[in-house]
A protein has these predicted regions:
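Alpha-helical transmembrane segments of multi-pass integral membrane proteins
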Residues: 1-185
């Protein structure tokens, strides 16, 4: 859990560097500072009660928010003339962090406030949300071009170097599932 929180904290300077470097995307100041309280809250609650399942799930939410922000900023930067490899990686990172955020929130809400699953339905919902995380790597094998989440600027089709042509009939299903998960956010 400490490593996850450190990844979230490391995403902060990545976001700032991508925005503040020459040619960076124009974003609001609130986007740059919004993830800071998430990292601070995650660190504070984890320092106080690292054994608590509720705290660990909250740490996951707090760590994924700055990672998702960094992925979105990197995608905007890559869309403005960046290299295609970075654009592909940024789209996959954005999908992964959005689905990870949904999973972390579902996991937290399922056990809040007691720290245990109170019904089998809650456990089933967390397992279903965890399965949705598998959509991201599956999308890497079936979709070409990759579907991108909505951004400030329209993106050109993003070529996927990992796509397997034989799996392309599954592409609309996976793209729809990724879109459904992103609509939950």
């Amino acid at each position: 859990w400490t490593g996850l929180l450190l990844l979230g904290a490391a995403a902060l300077p990545v976001t700032w560097a991508a925005v503040l470097a020459p040619g960076g995307p124009a974003v609001s100041v609130s986007l740059l500072i919004m993830p800071i309280p998430f990292v601070a809250v995650g660190a504070l609650v984890y320092a106080r009660r690292p054994e608590s399942l509720v705290v660990r799930r909250l740490v996951a939410v707090c760590a994924v928010v700055p990672m998702a922000t960094a992925a979105a900023v990197l995608l905007e930067r890559a869309a403005h003339g960046g290299d295609a490899g970075l654009l592909w990686a940024a789209v996959m990172a954005q999908h992964g962090t959005v689905v990870g955020f949904v999973l972390a929130v579902v996991g937290l809400l399922a056990i809040f406030p007691t720290g245990i699953y109170e019904t089998p339905f809650e456990r089933a919902m967390v397992r279903l949300a965890a399965l949705s995380l598998l959509l991201v790597p599956v999308a890497a094998f079936v979709n070409d071009p990759l579907p991108a989440l909505k951004t400030e600027s329209p993106l050109p089709p993003i070529h996927n170097p990992l796509a397997v042509a034989a799996l392309s009939p599954l592409a609309p299903l996976i793209a729809g599932a990724l879109e459904a998960v992103s609509l939950l956010v």
